[in-house]
Every structure is written in C-alpha cells, then in structure tokens.
Amino acid sequence: RKRESKLSVERFDQITEENILDVCSHQIVDSTLKLREIYNDTVENFFQGDRKALKELADAAERLAMTSSEHHKYDILPILYKMQSRSLDMGYHFVQALEHLNEATQSLSQFSESIFTYVDNNHTPFTIDQVDDLKEVHTALIKLLDEYCKMLQTGTYIQFDYTMVAQEQLLQLVAKATKRQIKRAQRNQTRTRSSLLYLNMLNEMRFMAVQVRALTNDERNFVAA
C-alpha cells in the first residue's frame, strides 16, 4: 500500500496546470489500447488452445486491472485538486471515465482468467457452432473497440454518435448467441462447464463494450469541458 501511494505521489508531482489534460487523457487512452490488445489476443489464443500465451495474457490483464484500480483509488482526489481552476464538468467526466475504465479492466481480467483456467484444466473444447457464434461476436466487438480507440487516440469524436448503431448490433449478436447456447444446453449438446464459460465470455464481452463506450463518451466530454 505504501508503494502504491508513493507511485501516486510521483504522478501527482508531474502534473501541472498546463499538462493536466494531456496527462489524464494519455492515462485513459493507453489503458484502453492495452485492454483492446489483451482482449483480442486472449480470444485468438483461446481458439488456438495456446495455454502458455493464455497464462501470460491472464497475468497481463490482472496487472492492467490492478494499475487501473490504483489510479482509481489514489489518483482521483490529487488530480481533482489540480483541476481546481478548471470547470466542474472536467472533474466530473474524468472521475466517470476512470470509473468506467476500472470496470472494463476488471471485466477483462475475469474474462482472461476464466479462459486460461478452462484451458489449463483441459476442459472440452468449444463445438464448431459455439466457435462460429463467438467469432461473430468477437469480430463485431473488435471493430467497435477499434473505432473507440481511434477516437481516443486522435481526440476526434465526430463519429461517436454513429457508433450507436454498431453498438446495438453487437448487443443483438450477444443476445442471439446467448439464446443459441441456452438451446444447445437444453438439448445436452454441450457440457456444463463449456456452457458456463461460453455464457460468461459473452456477458463479459457485452459488459466491456458498454464500459468502453461510456469511458469514450466521458473522455470526449472531459476534453471538451
């Protein structure tokens, strides 16, 4: 705990009135890019059954979640203090963005860990139908995450409102895949552990999409405040 506080103090000392916007935005953008990378690599290596890679990715996801949690616990108040001369809206949207980032990274950590545990315990591989449905959701989510990451990196949010259509389509794909899996389970076409992991993966994918969209919106408002 002392080490975490010390790191926070060091970050705080580096922040000035002039660079506070850039420092805070960089923190959010960098973490979101890492989340996208770890998520994509986790799914790809799950399809390939690469146990070693999945272990490394689960560890990376845990580190990202811990870092995000530290920022959330120790950085908010010191940074808000530095924002005293700025608008209240700026502080509000920064807090909200960190909250959504923290939720998204915790979800990613659970997602990656559950997948690694499943593969490490040599449970039954997903069926072709499960993989096909999951790939459809995964492709839609990656496309959406890429859009959000592009906005965060460039600071240009003109297309943000248009992503709502893609977001809704993703949620519909998740709902469809969930219903198809429930039907498979009812017909005893998949094992219990396989069904549980599959449904958990879909739920976390949906949750991450919602949280990243929310943090992108708050980052947009934070920069504009």
Mark where each language-model region is.
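Cytosolic, long alpha-helical scaffolding segments
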Residues: R1-A225
